[in-house]
Structures are given as C-alpha cells and as structure tokens.
Amino acid sequence: MGLVKVIKNKAYFKRYQVKLKRRREGKTDYYARKRLTVQDKNKYNTPKYRLIVRLTNKDIVAQLAYSKIEGDVVVASAYAHELPRYGLKAGLTNYAAAYATGLLLARRHLKAIGLDSTYKGHEELTGEDYNVEEEGDRAPFKAVLDIGLARTTTGSKIFAVMKGVADGGINVPHSESRFFGFDQESKDYNAEAHRDRILGKHVADYMSLLKEEDEDRYKRQFSKFLSNGMNADNLVATYQKAHANIRADPSPSAKKAAKPSKRHTAKRLTYDERKQRVADKKALLLQLKEQQQE
C-alpha cells in the first residue's frame, strides 16, 4: 500500500480527539499507569497501592497511594526535608538521604495501620537484599514501585528509597539487579558496597580526600555539613543514629497553626454598614456647614 496523505479538511478536525492533558504536557506515562493501577477483576474493593518516588533538585518525595476515579488518594508520605528532625541536617538529596526517606515512609505507615510491631523490617543494616515474610494473622502491606518518567538506572536514588521501604517492613516486589553494587557483567551483588553507600561512606571518603587536596574548596563545598557538626569522621555514625531515631518515632511533626493571610483589598460592607456610613457622612457635612455659617 502506498503513502496515504492525511487530508486535514473540516471532517478531519471535526473528528480529531486530543490526547489526555498530562500526556500532552509529558507528565504521565499512561501505558505504565494503567498497569500500575488496574486491579485484578476478582478482587473487589481492594486497591492496588503504589510506592511513588519522585526526585527534585532540593527534595526527595516518597508516597504510598492508590487510584480512584476522582484521582489518586495518598495514604502516607515522607520527604527528605523532614530528616533534620532525626539528625540529618545536610545532604538531603544524596543516596543515603534517599534510603532514610524510604525507611521513614515505611515505619510511619506501618505504625499508622498497626503493623509496626509485627513487621519490623531489616533492623540490622547489612546491604543484603531483604523481602518481608508473612507473620501472624495479617499479611504484610504490599506496594508496587512507581517511578514516573525516570529512567531505571542501576544504582539510582529511586532504588535507594525502595530499599529503605523494603527494609522498613513493606513488601515491595523487586530484585537486587538495580541496587548499587550489582555488576551487570558478572551478575554478582556486592552487599557491602551497597551498605557503605547507604551509610554515606562515599561522601565521607570524598570529604577526607578534598580536605587534603584543597581545604578552601572543602570548606566551601561542605559548609552546610561542617556548620551542623557533620564531618568525615562522624558521618557514618550520624546516618546510623538517624535510622535509629526514625525507627523510634516515625510519626509526622504536628502542623503549625496557619497564620491569617494579609488582606490587600477592602472588606465588603453589609447593607446596614453601608447605610450607616452614608448617614455618618451626611452628619459630618451638616456639621461642617453649620460651622461655616457661624
């Protein structure tokens, strides 16, 4: 069959159907979303939960959500900007912070649904691959990873968040092939290297190296770390302490009372107020007129 030229006449435009808004904006992959959200037909009123991970320039977002016709419902969320509460006051977008954010999300949600004591997760960090096993009467909470439009690169921070969630006690179907430390050629997984990455040892090593080579650049580049008492010697211990603090109290901080917004426009008066305002103006004008006549 030869080339068929599309004739863009009135009938073409009349029948033309635009794609969905978020597809036109390049924000949602609906091919993937359909497979992440559609539940089996023999399961009724059982939502399929998604572990949503998004990376920004200044933050790491981790959420547990399920979809409804009206839109997605977020049941739990954790952010890297919450980590200063647990002792991590700098480096909130690195690999170690991504793991801590995932751990915070898992422990927070399990505490909310009353499974934190049953499924404690992998309490001793070894870097080994960990999958939750069913214990007691209630099955572990299950969620599938949703990475949006990000690339599934081996060693990505997205999988650090997933590792934190899995170690926190939530069942996330995965394999070790995308973790840091996995060799694509030999198919071997170096758990020790992954553990060092999670505890920020690579950052500590670079801090030591940079301090020896160029101290001025070291002070400039790691100024936030140094001002908060984080250096190459105590960095690994700081991350370990943060993990312990997260497990001790994963609950979100209390919201501050919202301040009343400043009003930049005049408040609308009621009918009685407008009537009284006119009467006051009339009285003032009459008073001024009497003063002039005197």
Swiss-Prot record:
This is Large ribosomal subunit protein uL18. Component of the large ribosomal subunit (LSU). Residues 256-267 have a biased composition (Basic residues). The gene is rpl-5. Its main location: cytoplasm. Belongs to the universal ribosomal protein uL18 family. One of its GO terms (molecular function) is structural constituent of ribosome. The keyword Cytoplasm applies. Pfam families: Ribosomal_L18_c (PF14204), Ribosomal_L5e (PF17144). The keyword Nucleus applies.
